[in-house]
Amino acid sequence: MNIAKMIDHTLLKPNATKSEIEKLCNEAKEYGFASVCINPCFVDLAYSMLKDTDVKVCTVIGFPLGANTIETKVFEAVEAVKKGATEVDMVLNISMLKSGDYDYVKKEIEEVVKAVKSYGDIVVKVILETCYLTVEEKVKACQLTKEAGADFVKTSTGFGPGGATVEDVKLMRQAVGENFGVKASGGVRTAEDAKAMIEAGANRIGASAGVKIVEEWNKLKMS
């Protein structure tokens, strides 16, 4: 297993600098990560550094609260794709989900999916922010995401009070079935963490500690 190809090399902190993003992109090229996951203002910079490589540019939409209007999320996603992003991680509207307005939640995801996929094979990951949800809400969010035509469910923003757990990843994998993406993010900091998430059903890992994870993985010769 090539662990690097399962990692979105991530830097989303609010005080990230251009030079830190450049370092992130260089590390992604060196280690062969699946993507870099960065804030929207850095998409053009990341694209300029990675356009001739296999590393994808991933950005976040409606981040980190998920509380923007549908129109705003669509605009943000389309703008990112026009600047070179080929993966978008959108935060679903947590308030609407918890209010039981499932039509809104599904429509929002559908609108973003439809808008970005008109530009090509863009991967859409939907962040559930599992730390705020009941088991029933997590399952419902997974079902809505799948029905709406997205490609992945993702656990967390990393900005909430809790990140990915093995239990949540197992539940999400069970809810979406085999042929769908599950991304574990938030608090995945070691090779052991990554292995636990993959064994639970994740096929993508979001982590700012990607380099450390790969180096530990190779040293321990995990499979």
Swiss-Prot record:
<comment type="pathway">
    <text>Carbohydrate degradation; 2-deoxy-D-ribose 1-phosphate degradation; D-glyceraldehyde 3-phosphate and acetaldehyde from 2-deoxy-alpha-D-ribose 1-phosphate: step 2/2.</text>
</comment>
<feature type="active site" description="Proton donor/acceptor">
    <location>
        <position position="183"/>
    </location>
</feature>
<keyword id="KW-0704">Schiff base</keyword>
<comment type="function">
    <text>Catalyzes a reversible aldol reaction between acetaldehyde and D-glyceraldehyde 3-phosphate to generate 2-deoxy-D-ribose 5-phosphate.</text>
</comment>
<keyword id="KW-0963">Cytoplasm</keyword>
<dbReference type="GO" id="GO:0005737">
    <property type="term" value="C:cytoplasm"/>
</dbReference>
<dbReference type="InterPro" id="IPR013785">
    <property type="entry name" value="Aldolase_TIM"/>
</dbReference>
<keyword id="KW-0456">Lyase</keyword>
<comment type="similarity">
    <text>Belongs to the DeoC/FbaB aldolase family. DeoC type 1 subfamily.</text>
</comment>
<dbReference type="GO" id="GO:0006018">
    <property type="term" value="P:2-deoxyribose 1-phosphate catabolic process"/>
</dbReference>
<feature type="active site" description="Proton donor/acceptor">
    <location>
        <position position="89"/>
    </location>
</feature>
<feature type="active site" description="Schiff-base intermediate with acetaldehyde">
    <location>
        <position position="154"/>
    </location>
</feature>
<dbReference type="InterPro" id="IPR028581">
    <property type="entry name" value="DeoC_typeI"/>
</dbReference>
<protein>
    <recommendedName>
        <fullName>Deoxyribose-phosphate aldolase</fullName>
        <ecNumber>4.1.2.4</ecNumber>
    </recommendedName>
</protein>
<dbReference type="InterPro" id="IPR011343">
    <property type="entry name" value="DeoC"/>
</dbReference>
<dbReference type="GO" id="GO:0016052">
    <property type="term" value="P:carbohydrate catabolic process"/>
</dbReference>
<dbReference type="InterPro" id="IPR002915">
    <property type="entry name" value="DeoC/FbaB/LacD_aldolase"/>
</dbReference>
<dbReference type="GO" id="GO:0004139">
    <property type="term" value="F:deoxyribose-phosphate aldolase activity"/>
</dbReference>
<dbReference type="GO" id="GO:0009264">
    <property type="term" value="P:deoxyribonucleotide catabolic process"/>
</dbReference>
<dbReference type="Pfam" id="PF01791">
    <property type="entry name" value="DeoC"/>
</dbReference>
